[in-house]
Regions:
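Domain-level signal for soluble alpha/beta catalytic cores
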Residues: 1-287
Length: 287
């Protein structure tokens, strides 16, 4: 089914964190995206765990698949993305689930870097499109400016479902100093964008408060993908305090607020998604 049509009648449960879960599960500090080439079964296993937990939507392991983070030329980044798409498809293996091309921020330093990054966002999006991916998830951004040209250009060439989510702190402001209200309004004003919302940055309780204050865009699908909670370093391990049961309870509040797309970011695991999936009402639309 077309994702737009599905979301008109049913909420969507996504996967949870990849990077923090990869680090904890495999006890490594390696960049997770490198495993698309070097450890494909490890990547596939995580996708499968989320699907088995109840996710109907998984994001490719490509959040940091860019030239700056991988320190490779774009030809190698392209291979990394292509491998990630194939791994995700192998994991889905006939299940009724969507695959989204995951695109995170490219680190920049100055106007020249920003211009290069804007072009690379388009090249990344095009690579996904050429692989047959029709859903793109631009996540954890501090503003819209850097990715907007790529979104408009790729949508002029391919039929895409575009998701854009921003990361804000508990006070509702991004690293660029922009409020959640402005970020959501700016993204909602772009015709090419289908879904807007927040991810990372805060736990589910603060995310509900921020979205309630910011207001939810009426003509776009709303996504809410919070962290498990707030991290603490214990015995050299990054830990998040909230339990899967607590997370699921708070996600009910986000669903009641009108969120159409619900999932988890840093610190969440398949157990978090599984706990959320157990509640029958999570898929119901709030009218």
């Amino acid at each position: 089914m077309n994702l737009r049509e599905y979301l008109k009648t049913t909420n969507l449960i996504t996967d949870g964190a990849f990077g923090t879960y990869f680090a904890a599960k495999y006890q490594t500090q390696d960049i997770p995206e490198l495993a698309n080439i070097t450890a494909t079964e490890k990547v596939k296993k995580i996708h499968e765990e989320y699907l088995n937990a109840g996710a109907k939507f998984i994001r490719t392991n490509t959040f940091a698949s860019n030239t700056e983070t991988l320190q490779e030329d774009f030809a190698e980044v392209e291979k990394n993305i292509q491998a990630a798409v194939e791994i995700a498809r192998d994991a889905v293996n006939g299940r009724d689930a969507w695959i989204a091309g995951d695109i995170g921020p490219i680190p920049v330093n100055g106007a020249e870097d920003a211009a290069a990054a804007a072009d690379e966002y388009y090249q990344i999006a095009k690579t996904f499109a050429e692989c047959g991916v029709t859903v793109l998830d631009f996540e954890t951004f501090a503003d819209l400016d850097g990715i907007l040209p790529a979104i408009k250009k790729i949508c002029a060439e391919y039929e895409m479902f575009i998701m854009v989510s921003f990361s804000v702190n508990q006070f509702g402001y991004s690293a660029a100093g922009l409020s959640a209200k402005r970020l959501l309004a700016d993204a909602a004003a772009v015709p090419e964008i289908d879904a807007v919302g927040l991810n990372c940055g805060v736990g589910p309780a603060h995310m509900r408060q921020i979205l309630e204050k910011a207001g939810c865009p009426g003509d776009k699908f709303l996504l809410a993908i919070p962290n498990a909670g707030y991290p603490t370093l214990t015995r050299n391990k990054l830990q998040f305090g909230n339990t899967p049961a607590y997370f699921a309870e708070k996600m009910k509040e986000l669903q009641a607020l009108g969120a159409d797309i619900l999932g988890g970011c840093c610190g969440t695991t398949p157990e978090f998604i599984g706990e959320m999936s157990l509640w029958d009402g999570i898929l119901n639309k709030i009218v």
